[in-house]
Amino acid sequence: MECSWLRAVALVAVLVGLHGCATGMTARDRSSPSATVTLVHLNDVYEILPVEGGKSGGLARVATVVQALKAAHPAVLTTLGGDYLSPSALGTARIDGQPLAGRQMVDVLNATGLDVATLGNHEFDVSEAAFRSHLVQSKFRIVSTNVTDAGDKPFPGVPTSLIVPITSGPRSLRIGFVGVTIDSTRKPWVRYRDAIASARAELEALRGKVDAVVALTHLSLEQDAQFVEAVPGIDLVLGGHEHENWLMYRGPRFVPVVKADANARSVAIVTLSFGAPGERPSIAVRLQKIDDTIAATPAVDAVARAWVEKAFDGFRREGFSPEAVVATITEPLDGRESTVRNRAGRLTDLIASALAREADPVDVALFNGGSVRIDDVVPPGPITEYDIIRILPFGGRIVKATLDGALLSRVLEIGLANEGLGGFLHASGARREDGAWLVQGRAIDPGRRYSVALTDFLLSGGETNLGFLTRANPAVRDVRELRDIRRAVIEELRREVLTR
């Protein structure tokens, strides 16, 4: 089957989309390899059950793929390129007074048979206590070359590099792993070392001790390209952070950089073929779509569903009815990250309308695309309260405030410039026309005060490039807290159906 080509980006010599590829793409041909090792890679997994109405993903299906590969050839390792503790709708459920905060993810990944992972930036969304607890809970190995605790020491059980012995036929091989993470989530209890310098030091320590070096990365695509160019000696990069699959080759050694689709919609299957000892392995990559044609492994599925029921009990105690049908929708609601961080759509319009109605009367309603975490399309049909929790897992209150026109104009302009980021803003009541911002059809008056509905997070100053948007800003006045945004969206959906 032919592989489809994806967009070219700066600093990338060759970028190939993996969608639908059934044939391998080989960095260097070698006849009759004497040993092979297969790596099954996934990244950015927040859901333990299938997504897209059950059509795609599901860790129990991933387990089936891994087991089938091991049955044919036992030398198989399963890897994860970070982002698994958060953000997750189930992770916000409280059990015994504490949020799950990824506990369910670790348990299901343990059952799936994950071998090696690195840390993603969203691992640090949870509390330090929860993070450290999950390290103990994990049966898989975690490697992190550039992330330490506040004392600049590795977290317990998280080495800066890792050597995994594996037997392939008559050969005993040693695969070296390093792991690096983007420094985008800053917490007092986390420190980031320079990824390139840290990896170079670890590769020097691994020299002569391993048959291949694999870098597990949670970096942007551009950073991955720079990383491979700057760190010689890496044979393969298995990445994360992007939520869509990528394959690119970089550097003088034509090193593959591989990413799968988020939420286990696909896994990358990478075969390392070893010839004579000391020679670089040849590498072949293919994408395996994870969908409803693959049976779920019953034991893993049972673990996942048990956690869903525990989480649902937690939501019920908070006053939600997760299985209750809110409405029957006739159009899909697109909550994919690639959509909500770049343009408006049916879902974002619905959320903005819910904010405006909750704060009525109001001139403008604003929220950040990054608050939508479902990274999925809700198909036409019944939509439940749990679907709304999946869409907005962080919840938070809607707030109504008065903003000076100059500040509102600045916020809107930066929100538009944040295209592609979580800080891309969606608005009701405001639009840009001929280079100027209009509110309720009229140009913003810098000296006028406007009533604005927004989320408490957006008013915390925590969003990208919007650190000035806080309650302490003198141009922000009359702040009043309203209901949880999820309650307002549930009510807005019900109202839309009734008035159709």
Where are these regions (language model features)?
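Acidic, metal/ion-coordinating pockets
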Residues: A22-P298, N342-R357, A365, I391, ...
